[in-house]
Regions:
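Start-of-helix register in tetratricopeptide repeats
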Residues: 32, 65-66, 98-100, 132-134, ...
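Residue-level signature for tetratricopeptide repeat
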Residues: 39-40, 74, 106-109, 142, ...
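Structural motif corresponding to the intra-repeat A-B loop/turn of tetratricopeptide repeats
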Residues: 44, 78, 110-112, 146
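TPR-repeat structural position
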Residues: 47, 81, 113-115, 149
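Single-residue signature of alpha-solenoid repeat helices
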Residues: 50, 84, 116-118, 152
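Short coil turns that delineate tetratricopeptide repeat
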Residues: 62, 95-96, 128-130, 163-164
């Protein structure tokens, strides 16, 4: 969403989605676009709109991995860990990064840090490239969310200065 093209694309997709929902017209929209709109609604504190969109996305794409992951994270956010875990366990591609991060977060939330660490090491690539540092950023956020500052710093401080989201990493380091 950082590029002008994406901003324009997202605005157009939101306008189309909202217009079609408002008129009750049947329409198709791919799952990835719907999840971009859902993320926008969440970041804009439009919870009702995000939930309504998820109901639509689930009907349109009931087996889509991305839709299922977002649904699970919504449930987790509402404190419905068991229901969320059921969805995550039902996703065919258990190697999915977001699925693995969910399991790691579950272990951290339950203070099973050694288990989370084993899962983390199993999933991190042997050689890190630019996009792989997203793992470190996500892990840092997870550990901070549950009060494990030293574990968070272990990952956040390994993120290179030229990483595209380094400013977010610096914010998290300051928070720790």
């Amino acid at each position: 969403m950082g590029t002008p093209y994406m901003d324009k694309y997202l605005k157009e997709a939101i306008a189309e989605y909202e217009q079609k929902i408002e008129t009750g017209e049947d329409f198709y929209m791919d799952a990835s676009t719907l999840m971009d709109i859902e993320e926008y609604y969440e970041k804009s504190n439009r919870k009702y709109d995000a939930e309504r969109l998820m109901r639509f996305a689930e009907k349109l794409h009931p087996d889509n991995e991305e839709v299922l992951v977002v649904k699970a994270y919504q449930l987790k956010g509402d404190g419905k860990w068991n229901e969320a875990m059921g969805i995550i366990k039902g996703i065919a591609n258990q190697a999915n990064r977001d699925v693995q991060l969910f399991y790691i977060e579950w272990d951290v939330a339950c203070s099973r840090l050694d288990k989370a660490e084993v899962r983390t090491q199993h999933n991190l690539p042997a050689v890190m490239n630019d996009n792989d540092y997203d793992w470190y950023l996500d892990l840092g956020e997870i550990y901070l969310d549950y009060g494990f500052q030293k574990r968070a710093l272990k990952y956040l401080e390994q993120i290179p200065k030229n990483y595209q989201f380094r400013s977010r990493a610096d914010e998290l380091i300051a928070e720790a």
